[in-house]
Swiss-Prot record:
<keyword id="KW-0687">Ribonucleoprotein</keyword>
<dbReference type="InterPro" id="IPR000911">
    <property type="entry name" value="Ribosomal_uL11"/>
</dbReference>
<dbReference type="InterPro" id="IPR020783">
    <property type="entry name" value="Ribosomal_uL11_C"/>
</dbReference>
<dbReference type="InterPro" id="IPR006519">
    <property type="entry name" value="Ribosomal_uL11_bac-typ"/>
</dbReference>
<dbReference type="Pfam" id="PF00298">
    <property type="entry name" value="Ribosomal_L11"/>
</dbReference>
<dbReference type="Pfam" id="PF03946">
    <property type="entry name" value="Ribosomal_L11_N"/>
</dbReference>
<comment type="subunit">
    <text>Part of the ribosomal stalk of the 50S ribosomal subunit. Interacts with L10 and the large rRNA to form the base of the stalk. L10 forms an elongated spine to which 2 L12 dimers bind in a sequential fashion forming a pentameric L10(L12)2(L12)2 complex.</text>
</comment>
<dbReference type="InterPro" id="IPR036796">
    <property type="entry name" value="Ribosomal_uL11_N_sf"/>
</dbReference>
<dbReference type="GO" id="GO:0070180">
    <property type="term" value="F:large ribosomal subunit rRNA binding"/>
</dbReference>
<dbReference type="GO" id="GO:0006412">
    <property type="term" value="P:translation"/>
</dbReference>
<keyword id="KW-0699">rRNA-binding</keyword>
<dbReference type="GO" id="GO:1990904">
    <property type="term" value="C:ribonucleoprotein complex"/>
</dbReference>
<comment type="similarity">
    <text>Belongs to the universal ribosomal protein uL11 family.</text>
</comment>
<dbReference type="GO" id="GO:0019843">
    <property type="term" value="F:rRNA binding"/>
</dbReference>
<dbReference type="InterPro" id="IPR020784">
    <property type="entry name" value="Ribosomal_uL11_N"/>
</dbReference>
<dbReference type="InterPro" id="IPR036769">
    <property type="entry name" value="Ribosomal_uL11_C_sf"/>
</dbReference>
<keyword id="KW-0689">Ribosomal protein</keyword>
Length: 133
């Protein structure tokens, strides 16, 4: 199962509790382990892929934060534009896009850093963020 949880803030309340409860996972054990693994990434949303086994034990893999979350943090904005084609909400430099692309590289299916940068730039465009050199 896949969830997106704020780093270091997993607790048994929804959405975490019900999703794990259905699978019969020890919710507190997951929360403690997740919070310990993501404590250094406070403020970001971390996608996590949880594998639950027959005996109700589990493993999980944390992914890199979504590109949109990293772009919002880099641009210092609360949310993207409602009309990205009409009103732009922020501007970020291309080297910042490279940083984000390098961070996201393990989770993107891009062959090169340039291809990853193009993906991140596309996300930025769809959020109303202008990328400049």
């Amino acid at each position: 199962m896949k969830l997106q949880i704020p780093a270091g803030k997993a607790n048994p309340a929804p959405p975490v509790g019900p999703a794990l409860g259905q699978a019969g996972v020890n919710i507190m054990a997951f929360c403690k382990e997740f919070n310990a693994r993501t404590a250094d990434q406070a403020g970001l949303i971390i996608p996590v892929e949880i594998t639950v086994f027959e005996d109700r034990s589990f493993t999980f893999i944390t992914k890199t934060p979504p590109a949109a979350v990293l772009l919002k943090k880099a641009a210092g904005i609360e949310s993207g534009s409602g009309e990205p084609n009409r009103n732009k909400v922020a501007t970020i430099k291309r080297d910042k896009v490279r940083e984000i692309a390098e961070l996201k590289m393990p989770d993107l299916n891009a062959a090169s850093i340039e291809a990853a940068m193009r993906m991140i730039e596309g996300t930025a465009r769809s959020m109303g963020i202008v990328v400049e050199d």
